[in-house]
Amino acid sequence: MVAVAAFSSSGQDKPAHTPKLGLFVYILAAASVIGGFLFGYDTSVVSAAMLYMPDAPGLKPMDTVWQEVLVSISPGMAAVGSLMSGTSSDYIGRRKVILGASAIFTIGALVCAASVNKIMLLVGRVLLGIAIGFASMIVPVYLGETAPTHVRGMLVAAFALMISFGQVVANITGGAFSYIDPYNVGWRLMFAFAAVPSIIQFVCFMFLPETPRWLYENGFETETREVLEKVYNGDKEWVEYEMAEIIAFNEDQAKENEKAHASGPVIWRILKTPHVLKACFIGSMLQAFQQLAGINTILYYTADIIRSSGISNNHTTIWISVLLSLCNFIGPFVPMSLIEKVGRRIIFLFSCGLVVLSLVFIGVAFLLVNHDSAATLPANQYGSNFNSSYPDAKGCMAYSNCDYCVTTDACGFCHDANTKQGYCLPAGFDNPEVYSSTGSCTNSNGSIANNFKWEKYYCDTKYTLLPIIACGVYLLTFSSGFTSLPWVLNSEFYPMWARSTCVAISTTSNWVFNLIIALTYLSLTQVIGKYGAFWLYAGLTVIAFIFILFLVPETKGYSIEEVEMLFMNKKQRREAESRRRETVTEVRSRMNSTVSFGQHNEVHKY
């Protein structure tokens, strides 16, 4: 555990009263977290759309490779977008990057909806990925730099809540639009819907201000005070305190830079500043651990998990997905309501521990399914209509039961409808979901042989619903802290000069590991089984728990300028506190002189 003495970055006690929130803060927060909604919606809606796009006119044929590319290209481009947004937000401001992201969200959604071929659809998914990367990096930074200290954690947690809400809405709209000519119109409406909230966000940010910390950093002192007046609802005591904090931090940082002859790229300065490098490493690892806990395996492969329970109807699959996404939506209310009361660390550790248990539960559920699934018959009983020279035939024969068989794309289980015994056969070339390419479930005679049934995705067992229940428990426990805390902490960890770059690096870490987990899950299940894959994620989450326990500090109650000191050693912290007290004394002296001078002039005017 990280223990840190309480201190004030400005060397002065904070105002004793809690500032009252005005309408401005609520509008600012609501407009900002639309970025989280779009993040969740656009990463999830493709799951429902993919049930229809492979057979849509203009998009056929769409093989497995194309489907994987269309799904994974957005997370891949999000990593690029998050890196781009770090530098650009330093130069043009946080607000303009959010405006740019909103515009790209709108264009990407409309391009996807209007696609007449796979290339056009791919371009749209690339644009959406870049916009997701922008939003996932810049919205937490914007909220962290603008929100009052006592609600900062709650508002950044609201960003994570809106990611989950976007996923719920994606499944609901997917279900609703699936009834409107889904192969021609429905899937297009699923993508087009996202243009509505992105346009709303764009319009809102035309009138919302830049963050006060970016404004002061770039020489707009008057505008900084004006924004703080709105944020703190005209509370002069809090406005003066925050203004002194910002000025003191910037002047103190300027002295340090001059003393150290700081120059060159920000990334080089980060590498040469041990406590900032430490914070960036911890922040990046938290984002990596979020993905290593397997969250997007569940979110991206929800339909596969549901189908493994025996659900074959696409509409039913989508509506069950809605129920699971609701579990993911309920959880974030826990950190939103408790984060400013009990702190970040306790919620994070609690959620992390429950995630370990739920991952073990999922693994046990899949293990029970595996052990209860029908065994394959020995090779000498495959019959004369089985041709072992067919592609994948010998490989399929090697699987010992139905569960191992249907886990592999190339195979399916052909079983006697009465005895449940059967064969693992290669899937058919034209209709792999309906027939095998050889053996008793082939369509060589126009239909499958009497009493035989072909299963491509699931096995008949008494445990088939258990994985769905386990996934619901997992989503509930994961979203109760693991979803939001990496975003909250990364919005707080870094000094102003390094914030956008460090958040960009940590966000890129999230997207890179997102892509790695998404691309390796199916391969993992074929090597160590579905249960083995989730137990591996459980082991990685145990490491995350230990990492959080010993390396992540509590940031509750500290101003965003104070949090930087939590990563310093004791000597550095004492020096920083002393230096900042001296700076704030000078700042307050100047501020008081300015006020007195203004009052003196006013007396003589009248």
UniProtKB/Swiss-Prot annotation:
Reactions catalysed, as given in the entry: myo-inositol(out) + H(+)(out) = myo-inositol(in) + H(+)(in)
CDD domains (UniProt xref): MFS_HMIT_like (cd17360)
Chain segments annotated as transmembrane: 21-41, 64-84, 97-117, 119-139, 153-173, 189-209, 279-299, 318-338, 346-366, 465-485, 502-522, 532-552
Family: Belongs to the major facilitator superfamily. Sugar transporter (TC 2.A.1.1) family.
Record carries keyword Membrane: yes
InterPro entries linked to this entry: MFS_dom (IPR020846), MFS_sugar_transport-like (IPR005828), MFS_trans_sf (IPR036259), Myo-inositol_Transporter (IPR050814), Sugar/inositol_transpt (IPR003663), Sugar_transporter_CS (IPR005829)
Glycosylation sites noted in the Swiss-Prot or TrEMBL record: N314, N387, N445
Tissue: Expressed in the intestine.
Top-level taxon of origin: Eukaryota
GO function terms (MF aspect): myo-inositol:proton symporter activity
Main localization, broad class: membrane
Cellular-component GO terms for this entry: apical plasma membrane
Full protein name: Proton myo-inositol cotransporter hmit-1.1
